[in-house]
A protein has these predicted regions:
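Terminal targeting/low-complexity segments that flank the catalytic cores of oxidoreductases
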Residues: 1-69, 131-138, 146-154, 160-170, ...
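Active-site-proximal alpha-helical scaffolds that flank and shape metal-associated catalytic sites
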Residues: 4-14, 70-175, 222
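A short structural micro-motif
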Residues: 49-50, 77-81, 126, 182, ...
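A structural feature that tracks compact, well-ordered secondary-structure segments
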Residues: 72, 174-181, 188-192
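Extended, basic/helix-rich recognition subdomains
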Residues: 147, 183-184
Length: 223
């Protein structure tokens, strides 16, 4: 067994001690491999809003723990960074940006019908309103659940989808596969930089809200 897999299994074991770990498993067990191009595009749209709340949660964590060097190092890998650059029509060589900005630009690569876009934007905006009503500490410690195996498992599930044709989905897949790489590094991975925040079930509503927007965008994931 690889070091990366051992680390992922350990993180999964820790998360399953809490109810939010079951929600992560539920998300991973959705029918990702059957999702078509339209469904994947919808997921990319609502994931953009998740990436906004992730960035905000990291900013909250940094404000609560301004002297935490590990969180500072994590921050350097998520905000104002060139670690997703270059990517055609999204990021120039060496260009620094927040990761949610990469996703925002990604959505511009393929036009969707106006009514469909309004529906997806409404799902995302409602989600952000819900998340922003939650307490700051829960939002801060959620970072550890995302970075220390949670999102890596979700991303590995998403990339089992078969149809990634088109510039938007190619950019989204680049985002996902690079984040798998960032999070799985056994020594300097993003999970190693924040697991000391020790999440518990105070973050359960955040994971439930994430699952809800994925299913809202692509209800066929559950059928």
């Amino acid at each position: 067994m690889s070091i990366e897999q051992t680390q992922l299994d350990t993180a999964h074991k820790a998360s399953t001690e809490f109810s939010y770990g079951k929600v992560i498993d539920d998300i991973c067990n959705l029918k990702w491999s059957h999702l078509d191009r339209e469904g994947l595009t919808n997921v990319a749209w609502v994931y953009y809003y998740f990436s906004v709340q992730f960035r905000e949660n990291l900013e909250i964590a940094r404000s609560l723990y301004p002297d935490d060097d590990r969180l500072l190092q994590l921050d350097h890998g998520e905000r104002d960074t060139n670690n997703l650059s270059p990517w055609p029509r999204v990021a120039a060589t060496g260009e620094k940006m927040n990761h949610d900005e990469f996703m925002r630009r990604t959505l511009k690569l393929t036009t969707v019908a106006a009514e469909r876009q309004r529906r997806l934007e409404e799902i995302g905006k409602t989600y952000l309103t819900k998340v922003r009503s939650m307490d700051r500490m829960s939002r801060a410690v959620s970072i550890a659940s995302y970075e220390d195996g949670g999102l890596e498992n979700v991303f590995r599930a998403i990339v089992t989808a078969q149809d990634w044709d088109g510039p938007l989905l190619q950019a989204f897949k680049h985002f996902l596969t690079e984040h798998i790489r960032f999070d799985s590094d056994p020594e300097q991975g993003h999970g190693a930089l924040c697991r000391h925040l020790t999440p518990n079930d105070r973050i359960l509503p955040l994971w439930i809200a994430f699952k809800e927007i994925l299913l809202g965008a692509a209800p066929e994931l559950a059928t």
